[in-house]
């Protein structure tokens, strides 16, 4: 499986604009690839609430700055 590293300063499953766009990218890429995402710690709670509920969540690995 292809592995991808993404540095997304803002990434959040329940926001629009930059955080929402980054979430759209990583969640869709994770359907086909193993994705490692570096993002800000302020989004950690929101991300960790949603990722386990997603089928592709097993392919999404977050690292917080």
State what each model feature region is.
Residues 1-58:
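N-terminal subdomain of nucleotide-sugar transferases
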Residues 58-65:
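A short, charged, and often flexible helix/loop element on the N-terminal side
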């Amino acid at each position: 499986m292809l592995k991808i590293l993404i540095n997304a300063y803002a990434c959040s499953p329940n926001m629009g604009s930059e955080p929402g766009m980054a979430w759209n990218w990583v969640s869709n890429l994770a359907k086909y690839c193993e994705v490692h995402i570096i993002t800000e710690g302020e989004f950690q709670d929101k991300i960790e609430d949603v990722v386990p509920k997603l089928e592709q969540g097993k392919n999404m690995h977050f690292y917080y700055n």
